[in-house]
Design a protein with these regions (language model features):
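Catalytic core of membrane glycerolipid acyltransferases/transacylases, capturing the structured
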Residues: 2-61, 66-67, 77-94
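Non-catalytic C-terminal accessory region of glycerolipid acyltransferases
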Residues: 63-212
Length: 212
């Protein structure tokens, strides 16, 4: 499963895992792939590993897919989760297409997923880059409540969430193209465009981010 990434912290990953477990007929467990930084943070690393998460690299992705696991990845990475609120729901660049290569090598279908709701929980108004560099973080967000309210600023705003699972994109006929840069680029672009269009549909269904 390939989703858009947003919301300052990876709350969308948690919500996607819950949605998959609750909506899948067999209550499948989603194995999430995370950035190296996640596994260098003491508490977060432990929680992520206990929930079945692993480092986002092709070797681990292919190993999980070969064993029939359901794998979740967010190709935008920190570019998506740390973007400003003014750029909400505008997909960022999809890295080098590693998720496509892993899917092709294992013949695994790619399921694009659009997630609406994360952008509003911690709206990023500014990024204090000097402080982020000092703390060795990809960004240091300033939101309407953080850091002004201290720990209270970490409480997420109550946005309305919508998640759409798009039709799977088959890859079984493209196994021999796993090393073809053009095939990888085109397929990654197809996934990205599918998610972007789904986001537009969801936003039309949810005109008020905090409405019920």
């Amino acid at each position: 499963m390939v989703g858009n990434h947003s919301g300052t912290v990876a709350m969308d990953a948690l919500m996607l895992s819950i949605a998959v477990h609750d909506e899948h007929p067999k209550a499948r467990h989603l194995r999430l792939l995370g950035a190296d930084l996640v596994f260098r943070m003491p508490v977060l690393s432990e929680l992520t590993r206990k929930s079945g998460g692993t480092v986002a690299c092709n070797a681990d992705a292919e190993r999980l897919l070969h064993t029939g696991e359901l794998v979740g990845v967010f190709p935008e990475g920190f570019k998506g989760v740390g973007k400003h609120y003014r750029d909400r729901y505008k997909l960022q660049r999809f890295g080098r297409g590693g998720f496509v290569s892993a899917a092709l090598r294992t013949g695994t279908p790619i399921v694009p997923v659009a997630i609406v709701g994360a952008e509003e929980i911690y709206p990023i108004l500014a990024d204090l880059k000097p402080l982020a560099r000092l703390l060795k973080l990809p960004y240091f967000p300033v939101t309407p409540t953080f850091p002004w309210l201290g720990p209270l600023g970490l409480v997420p705003l109550p946005s309305k969430w919508l998640i759409e699972f798009c039709p799977p994109i088959p890859t079984a006929d493209l196994v021999d193209s796993a090393d073809d840069p053009m095939v990888i680029f085109n397929l990654a672009d197809q996934v990205r465009e599918t998610i972007q269009q789904a986001l537009h549909r969801l936003l039309e269904r949810r005109p008020d981010p905090f409405g019920r």
